[in-house]
């Protein structure tokens, strides 16, 4: 068995180094390779081996600040294309699984093993995000539609377990059979929901795949620069997952 870990990456050097540290420290039961599309981020190449990345250069702007990240349709189009290229690389490379991990997520060492032990074609690890500074954190999963929850889901997902969900993404382990069935991140022409993870989730369920969320080892989401600074001040990776 072999696994490919990867993502499109448009990230600061500081956060990317912490991200790589968390990937390096994953418990790995088999061959695990990694590959990243460095999206307008050529400086990050110095932290990778030559066979671990390709540069992806585009002209569109992407803005983020302490409030939120400002996504435009063109940003989503690029990310969708790069995620689909990672699917192609998974299939052509003979990998059994692809694990997508967004580049601002810090993973517990047992994340990969736990997701494999779930024995599901599609299973994600939970993380919680304040999309606006004054909001309550919400998870990287939902029950219905764009981002709708059943009444008890938020409280339920705070407890360690494995839960069937309606959609998920960003930190997700996917078996190659899902891709062989034709599931990908491309938008659906008759669905207006925003985001490639929603397109993937809808395509997966249309192909009779269930989506699962593991909550045993929540990832840490460094969504803002201030959250990265707090993470470092509190002891970084070692303190977060000791």
Q: Where is each model-derived feature located?
A:
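Short beta-strand-to-loop acidic/aromatic patch adjacent to the donor-nucleotide binding site
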Residues: 94-106
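Active-site beta-to-alpha loop of glycosyltransferases that engages the nucleotide-sugar donor
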Residues: 7-21, 40-41
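Active-site-proximal specificity loops/subdomain of glycosyltransferases
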Residues: 44-95
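A conserved acidic beta->alpha catalytic loop
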Residues: 12-13, 26-29, 36-50, 57-60, ...
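C-terminal catalytic/acceptor-binding lobe
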Residues: 166-168, 176-177, 181-242
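Hydrophobic targeting segments
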Residues: 2-7, 23, 33-37
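Short, acidic, metal-binding catalytic loop of nucleotide-sugar glycosyltransferases
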Residues: 18-32
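Conserved catalytic core of nucleotide-sugar-dependent glycosyltransferases
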Residues: 87, 108-188
